[in-house]
């Protein structure tokens, strides 16, 4: 989805991702780029491999509360750490960048054009996509996603 936003000119991959909880003046997390989130080298603290994101998945928390409050542990771009939070934050930033059409964006710009009509990405109770998991799809839609990936997004 971020790749589609790049193609549409909505996102520059090397620019900071607009995560709403990082808006305080001087917050060093505000310099974390889209690229660092997508490569899982944001430098944000996690509490273990993959980190625990159950609060957003089943605990009633929001993406912003679960992922947006993690402090920096390393300099961004220096350490890879598999992190669901980084993907959740990229999705949150994308929603903020897209604005009012954020809930329709995955369907209009990726899923339906690829023929993935039986895919459902879940949101938290505020309507922010989770996307680190909680995406339900048929095997055929998964195959369509694989073909899209194999063909360089075309």
Question: Which residue ranges define each predicted feature?
Answer:
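Conserved catalytic core of nucleotide-sugar-dependent glycosyltransferases
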Residues: 56
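Conserved catalytic neighborhood of penicillin-recognizing serine enzymes
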Residues: 24-52, 60-78, 85-88, 137-140
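Short beta-strand->loop
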Residues: 76-81, 91-97
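Active-site-proximal alpha-helical segments within enzyme catalytic domains
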Residues: 86-93, 133-154
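Active-site helix/loop module of the DD-peptidase/beta-lactamase fold
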Residues: 7-44, 69, 98-133, 137
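Generic structural signal for hydrophobic core residues of well-folded globular domains
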Residues: 5, 41, 93-97, 149-152
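Short glycine-/small-residue-rich flexible loop motifs, especially phosphate/cofactor-binding loops
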Residues: 3, 64, 108
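Active-site SXXK
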Residues: 1-13, 37, 90-94, 142-145
């Amino acid at each position: 989805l971020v790749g589609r936003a790049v193609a549409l000119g909505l996102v520059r991959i090397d620019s900071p991702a607009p995560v709403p909880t990082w808006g305080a003046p001087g917050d060093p997390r505000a310099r974390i780029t889209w690229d660092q989130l997508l490569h899982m080298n944001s430098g944000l603290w996690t509490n273990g491999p993959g980190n625990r994101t159950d609060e957003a998945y089943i605990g009633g928390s929001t993406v912003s509360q679960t992922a947006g409050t993690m402090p920096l542990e390393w300099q961004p771009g220096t350490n890879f750490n598999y992190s669901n939070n980084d993907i959740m934050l990229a999705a949150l930033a994308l929603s903020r960048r897209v604005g009012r059409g954020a809930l329709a964006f995955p369907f209009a710009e990726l899923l339906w054009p690829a023929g993935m009509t039986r895919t459902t990405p879940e949101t938290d109770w505020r309507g922010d996509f989770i996307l680190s998991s909680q995406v339900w799809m048929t095997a055929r839609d998964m195959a369509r996603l694989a073909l899209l990936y194999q063909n360089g997004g075309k």
